[in-house]
From Swiss-Prot:
The keyword Metal-binding applies. Pathway: Alkaloid biosynthesis. Its EC number is 2.1.1.-. InterPro entries: MeTrfase_7 (IPR005299), MeTrfase_capping (IPR042086), SAM-dependent_MTases_sf (IPR029063). May be involved in the biosynthesis of caffeine. Gene3D superfamilies: Methyltransferase, alpha-helical capping domain, Vaccinia Virus protein VP39. This is Probable caffeine synthase MTL1. It is an enzyme of class 2 (transferase). Mg(2+) binds at residues 179, 261, 263-264. One of its GO terms (molecular function) is metal ion binding. Belongs to the methyltransferase superfamily. Type-7 methyltransferase family. The keyword NADP does not apply. It comes from Coffea canephora (Robusta coffee). The lineage of its organism: Eukaryota, Viridiplantae, Streptophyta, Embryophyta, Tracheophyta. Binds 1 Mg(2+) ion per subunit.
Length: 385
């Protein structure tokens, strides 16, 4: 089975769907919104071609469920707020939004939400239906998605860690797995495996930057948010917990060791310095600002986390309930690729053990994601300077 067929979130609206388990991302979007407004402010001041008539934006790796339209809402609100601050008396521009993700993404679940979204946008923002046009653009952001110099603003949230393929070189010339008992480039992985993952990320991220520079107008903006490498004190990350859960099943005899050794997740968490250096080396973009922030990986569990998300009764608000919440989120993201390799029957057992391990981390007050926000501007051509 092709990687792109299984590298997607759980669709639909069931209990294991991404739509029902993406409150962490909702909280993260709230943290990013001030940076989004600043990025839009700089974009409108740059006075790009046609920007007062139609602003073309895209969400790269939009996934599915209500969070997809939260990103659109925040972008539209930021555009209208900044134009008001600038006392722009011209008629509001049309906003054309492209939602992009791999072909297997559940775009239909997003389309079902559009009628109510448009009505709410008209009621709360005064935007008449037709002044914000939303369409899907299926495809991989590791290749071209839009015509040359056609876009004003590009946004991506928690997608860049996914690689275009599992790195090559993870099996030796003798057919021996180089990344034994690991499922990604972890601290325990041997140096050749870590290098293979870094090389693949470097290739993919450099290609991503080059493709986006071709699609953006000169001085167009891009805002990226992603997980980045954290500190030792953050505790094991969720990929470590997933790896531990699968290893537990191997020890119990529920899974064969060879099944684990042949499984490698196409994901790489870069360091801040790695991302910064790659942007500078590719050369198409200027870094306007770069900032990190931490979130617990059980963030979004309750409304006490500064976000309007589903709440839980106090008697269940302990580390076990929080761990189950984290397990549901990770399952909604990785179940398709796990099921394609290990089979669907073992999935509940994997995430039961995941939750058990996560509870131990949460009890110790650990378990953090380090998040990176980076705002980029496409460098002007010499003829534009």
């Amino acid at each position: 089975m092709e990687l792109q067929e299984v590298l997607h979130m759980n669709g639909g609206e069931g209990e294991a769907s991404y739509a029902k388990n993406s409150s962490f991302n909702q909280l993260a979007l709230a943290k990013v919104k001030p940076f989004l407004e600043q990025c839009i402010r700089e974009l409108l001041r740059a006075n790009l071609p046609n920007i007062n008539k139609c602003i073309k934006v895209a969400d790269l790796g939009c996934a599915s469920g209500p969070n997809t339209l939260l990103t659109v809402r925040d972008t539209v609100q930021s555009i209208d707020k900044v134009r008001q601050e600038m006392k722009n008396e011209l008629e509001r521009p049309t906003i054309q939004v492209f939602l992009t993700d791999l072909f297997q993404n559940d775009f239909n679940s997003v389309f079902m939400l559009l009628p109510s979204f448009y009505r709410k946008l008209e009621k709360e923002n005064g935007r008449k239906i037709g002044s914000c046009l939303i369409a899907a653009m299926p495809g991989s952001f590791h290749g071209r998605l839009f015509p040359e110099e056609s876009m004003h603003f590009l946004h991506s949230s928690y997608s860049l860690q996914f690689l275009s393929q599992v790195p090559s070189g993870l099996v030796t010339e003798l057919g021996i797995t180089a990344n034994k008992r690991s499922i990604y480039s972890s601290k325990a992985s041997p140096p050749p495996v870590q290098k293979a993952y870094l090389d693949q990320f470097t290739k993919d991220f450099t290609t991503f930057l080059r493709m986006r520079s071709e699609e953006l107008l000169s001085r167009g903006r891009m805002l990226l948010t992603c997980i980045c490498k954290g500190d030792e004190c953050d505790g094991p990350n969720t990929m470590d917990l997933l790896e531990m859960a699968i290893n537990d099943l191997v020890v119990e005899g529920r899974l064969g060791e060879e099944k684990l050794d042949s499984f490698n997740v196409p994901i790489y968490t870069a360091s801040v310095e790695e991302v910064k250096c790659m942007v500078e080396e590719e050369g198409s973009f200027e870094i306007l600002y770069l900032q990190t922030f931490k979130l617990r990986y059980d963030a979004g569990f309750s409304i006490d986390d500064d976000c309007q998300v589903r709440s839980h009764s106090p008697e269940y608000s302990d580390e076990h309930a929080r761990a189950a919440h984290v397990a549901s989120l990770i399952r909604s993201v990785y179940e398709p690729i796990l099921a394609s390799h290990f089979g669907e029957a073992i999935i509940p057992d994997i995430f039961h053990r995941f939750a058990t391990n996560a509870a131990k981390v949460i009890r110790l007050g650990k378990g953090f994601y380090n998040n990176l926000i980076i705002s980029l501007a496409k460098k002007p051509e010499k003829s534009d300077v």
